[in-house]
Every structure is written in structure tokens, then in C-alpha cells.
């Protein structure tokens, strides 16, 4: 049994050794033909790569020409719309509110009737004052007649000088009483007039603060309604203290500074007004000063407490060199642009910028009118490289075509 097992192991080992020897001989016989093929392929690939780099397409870019323009200079700040006047309408007399003569949100004019207090008690008080005045006027008339008689009798010594003086004093006293009566009549008339509550200013009324039937008094703080004057309307915004000198100089030069109100996103112009005044002190916590501008607001585009972006035109720079904002780049050395020569070679040019907005930038130094600058395709540029200047629509087609050709090559492969 032991001898048969040893024989089987010897056969298995022999088979394995024979298989290994066959594989080694077969691999050695194929390697001399495969190696030359690989070696021949490598030079071909390298040559193809060099040929592709040498014959590759030029980098497509878009370009614009520097021009001269009259560029406005704006000072910008954040602001809030405020009513030119805000008035809380209160009653000046105590009484029962019997009528409201306005609709909430209505535009009213100064002097329009807004509310009515029950006038009954004030009419009674006026009638009493008028009655007392009439009574004292009759007393004065009688005293004056007696004084005239006393004066005639005094000439014949039928009355004493003392009696004449006493009658004169009575006349004077009655005249004083009448003056007081006239004041009482005027006061009663005023109380009656005040029972009719009118609009002190023109503007838009808000929501009513009290309903008809309530007893109101002059001490009520909430009042009856609030009127906000929106024609005209004001805008209060802030500017850095470094801009104060510019604004003051423009005012001293007699310029009317135009202020534009833009919406919250700064994308839509709402209205246009003029500078009204500057505050008399700087806020030490923010280093800013408050500016007030006034707008006619006839179209009601501005509303009290509305948040807006303010832009104030302070000057206009004439013959300024202007390029699109997309052409100006920022690097370690500062602002620069890529300039194109007549042969469409690009070179980096350092520039000094001035006034700028979302679309254009004023170049204070480094460029002249007529220079061509790259506005798109900048990330593919190197110093001295030759480029292909294309139109915007051409650039879009060129950007799509390589991917399409690559897809076709991949399909064939």
C-alpha cells in the first residue's frame, strides 16, 4: 500500500515539471517577434504627438477695442425710504367719535375732513358764551348812556365829580368784561371747530386706530389715524466719510446732484430725485454720514420704509479710456489685461483702473484708445502666444465642435 502511494506522487510531480518546461519554452519563442513591434510603435506615437502639437488649432478668444467715453462717477450707498412728513392725527377735544370720513389707504389733501366728534356740548358752550356777551354788551350800552347824562349834569354841578368818575369806571369795567366774553365765544367756537378733525398735511392715510362710537380724548397717544406724506418722499442713505469732500465740493460748485433709487437687487431703477441735505455729523461707530434725497414720487414707486440702493451722480469724467470689465484681471502684480497686436499675438499689460461698474472699467494708465484686449478665453493664454479672434457666436460653435469630433473618433475606435 505504501509503495503504490509513492508511485502516484512521483507521477504527479513529473506532470507538473513537464507543464512548466513547456510554458517556459513557448514564451521564449514568441518574445523576439513581439519586442520589435512594440519598439517600432513607440517612435511612431511620439512623432504623432509632436506633429499634433505643432499643427494644433489656435486658441479662440474674443476681443474688444478700448474706446473713449464720457463716464459718470457715482457714489453708492444703502438707504431707506422715509415719508417727507408723518403725522399722527389726534383729537384736540374730548368727546364721542360719531363719524369717519376716510377710507384706509386713501390719498387725502390738507384740510380734508377725516373724523367728526359729537358737537352737541360744544354748540351749547358756544351759545352760553354768546349769550353772556350779548348781556354784557347791553350793560355797556346802558352804562355809556348814564355816563353821557352825568357828563352833562356835571357841567351844571348837578352831580359830583366823584359820581362822574364812578360812572366812567363802570363803563371801563364793562368794556373789559366784554373783551373776556368775546374770548370765551372764540374759545367755544374753536372747541366746536375742533370737533371736525381735518387732515393737517396731504398724504396717504393708514389703518384706522379707533372705531366710530368710542369716547376719545386729546391725551390718546394712538390717535385716530396716521398720515404719511409720499408726494414728495425722501430717501436717507449713508456714504463713507471719505466721500464727504466730493459731495461738498459739488454743492459749492452749484451743481444739482441727481440721486437714483434702485431696487434691493440693484438691477432695476425705481426713481430719480435730487440731493436735499447732508447730516451735520459723522456716525463715529460706522464712519459714515447720512444723506437725504427727495423724490417727487408721482408714480408711487417708492414706499415708506422701503429698502433701496442709492446712486448719486457727482461728476462725469470726459474722454476716459474704457474697456469691458471682463478684460481686466487681477494677479500678484496687480490689475492687468491681455493686449493683442496686429498679428494677434497676446502680451500681458499692467493697468491702473478708475471708475468701474458691472459692464465697463475706466483705464487710468496702461492703455490707449484703439488698443485691442482679450475679453474671453483668457485662461488659455500665455505670453506671446498667437490666438484666433472670433465673434461670440463663432466661439460657441468652436467650443462645441471639438467634443463632437472627439465623439466620432471614439465611435470609430
From Swiss-Prot:
Pfam families per record: HlyD_D23
A single GO cellular-component term on record: plasma membrane
Location(s) in or outside the cell: Cell inner membrane
Stretches for region Disordered: 31-57, 392-413
Gene Ontology molecular function terms on file: efflux transmembrane transporter activity
Biased composition (Basic and acidic residues): 397-413
Major subcellular site: membrane
Signal sequence, renumbered to the chain: 1-20
Keyword annotations: Cell inner membrane, Cell membrane, Membrane, Repeat, Signal, Transport
InterPro entries given in the database record: CusB_D23 (IPR032317), Multidrug-R_MdtA (IPR022824), RND_pump_MFP (IPR006143)
Membrane topology category: Peripheral membrane protein
PANTHER family: MULTIDRUG RESISTANCE PROTEIN MDTA
Subunit structure: Part of a tripartite efflux system composed of MdtA, MdtB and MdtC.
Recorded family membership: Belongs to the membrane fusion protein (MFP) (TC 8.A.1) family.
NCBIfam families (alphabetical): PRK11556.1, RND_mfp
Protein name: Multidrug resistance protein MdtA
Naturally occurring in which organism (per UniProt): Salmonella heidelberg (strain SL476)
Amino acid at each position: 500500500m505504501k509503495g503504490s502511494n509513492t508511485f502516484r506522487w512521483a507521477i504527479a510531480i513529473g506532470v507538473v515539471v513537464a507543464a512548466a518546461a513547456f510554458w517556459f519554452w513557448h514564451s521564449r519563442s514568441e518574445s523576439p517577434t513581439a519586442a520589435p513591434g512594440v519598439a517600432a510603435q513607440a517612435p511612431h506615437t511620439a512623432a504623432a504627438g509632436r506633429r499634433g502639437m505643432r499643427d494644433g488649432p489656435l486658441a479662440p478668444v474674443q476681443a474688444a477695442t478700448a474706446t473713449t467715453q464720457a463716464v459718470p462717477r457715482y457714489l453708492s450707498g444703502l438707504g431707506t425710504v422715509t415719508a417727507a412728513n408723518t403725522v399722527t392725527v389726534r383729537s384736540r377735544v374730548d368727546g364721542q367719535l360719531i363719524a369717519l370720513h376716510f377710507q384706509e389707504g386713501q390719498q387725502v389733501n390738507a384740510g380734508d375732513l377725516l373724523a367728526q366728534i359729537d358737537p352737541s356740548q360744544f354748540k351749547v358752550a358756544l351759545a352760553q358764551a354768546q349769550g353772556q356777551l350779548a348781556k354784557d354788551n347791553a350793560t355797556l350800552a346802558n352804562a355809556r348812556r348814564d355816563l353821557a347824562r352825568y357828563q352833562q349834569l356835571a357841567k351844571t354841578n348837578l352831580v359830583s365829580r366823584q359820581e362822574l368818575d364812578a360812572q366812567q369806571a363802570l363803563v371801563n369795567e364793562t368794556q373789559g368784561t366784554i373783551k373776556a366774553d368775546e374770548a370765551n365765544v372764540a374759545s367755544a367756537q374753536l372747541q366746536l371747530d375742533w370737533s371736525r378733525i381735518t387732515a393737517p398735511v396731504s398724504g396717504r392715510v393708514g389703518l384706522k386706530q379707533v372705531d366710530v362710537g368710542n369716547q376719545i380724548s386729546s391725551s390718546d397717544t394712538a390717535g385716530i389715524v396716521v398720515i404719511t406724506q409720499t408726494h414728495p418722499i425722501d430717501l436717507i442713505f449713508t456714504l463713507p466719510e471719505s466721500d464727504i469732500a466730493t459731495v461738498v465740493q459739488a454743492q459749492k460748485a452749484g451743481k444739482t446732484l441727481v440721486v437714483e433709487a434702485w431696487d434691493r437687487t440693484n438691477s432695476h431703477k425705481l426713481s430719480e430725485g435730487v440731493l436735499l441735505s447732508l447730516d451735520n455729523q459723522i456716525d463715529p461707530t460706522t464712519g459714515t454720514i447720512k444723506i437725504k434725497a427727495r423724490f417727487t414720487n408721482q408714480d408711487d414707486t417708492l414706499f415708506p420704509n422701503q429698502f433701496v440702493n442709492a446712486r448719486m451722480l457727482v461728476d462725469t469724467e470726459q474722454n476716459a479710456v474704457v474697456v469691458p470689465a471682463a478684460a481686466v484681471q487681477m494677479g500678484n502684480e496687480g490689475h492687468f489685461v491681455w493686449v493683442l497686436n496686429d498679428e494677434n499675438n497676446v502680451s500681458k499689460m499692467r493697468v491702473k483702473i478708475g471708475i468701474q461698474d458691472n459692464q465697463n472699467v475706466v483705464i487710468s494708465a496702461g492703455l490707449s484708445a484703439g488698443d485691442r484686449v482679450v475679453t474671453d478665453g483668457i485662461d488659455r493664454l500665455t505670453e506671446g502666444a498667437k490666438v484666433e479672434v472670433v465673434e461670440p457666436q463663432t466661439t460657441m460653435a468652436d467650443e462645441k465642435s471639438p467634443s463632437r469630433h472627439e465623439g466620432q473618433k471614439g465611435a470609430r475606435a
